[in-house]
Amino acid sequence: MERTYVMVKPDGVQRNLIGNIVSRFEQKGYTLAAAKLVTLSKETAETHYSEHRERPFFGELVSFITSGPVFAMVWEGEGVIKAARQLIGATNPSEAAPGTIRGDLAVNVGMNVVHGSDSPESAEREIAIFFKEEELNDYQKDSNKWV
């Protein structure tokens, strides 16, 4: 089963948006395999966002993502990586479609509420940064036959 990493960023946690975001994934029939509230260390943040290391906004990004707790999640289901990206919406909220998480909830590109893996490779790498294998739950929901 395909898995993806989704993280509610500090602005989303502070604005009490965790439940709203979780509900959107549940309503699409995806299964929550793992979740935890954690405040990232600078080292973990730099590892997570390593592909942006040479970008001018890297320092601000690391500072923001370590400014408070994040809600780290692993979702699973068929096509969940692509579906999560569609649910999340464009990085810049002003370009995100209404009905997407960022289109409905994000304030600006710097505080865009949520992160989601953009590929199977990213999902695997990001899940491994935040979760040990034994923290990932593998179960079948009875409701799966209905969605």
UniProtKB/Swiss-Prot annotation:
Cofactor: Mg(2+)
Protein name in the entry: Nucleoside diphosphate kinase
Catalytic activity: a 2'-deoxyribonucleoside 5'-diphosphate + ATP = a 2'-deoxyribonucleoside 5'-triphosphate + ADP; a ribonucleoside 5'-diphosphate + ATP = a ribonucleoside 5'-triphosphate + ADP
Catalytic site: 115 (pros-phosphohistidine intermediate)
Family membership: Belongs to the NDK family.
EC number: 2.7.4.6
NCBIfam families attached to this UniProt entry: PRK00668.1
Any one Gene Ontology cellular component term annotated for this protein: cytoplasm
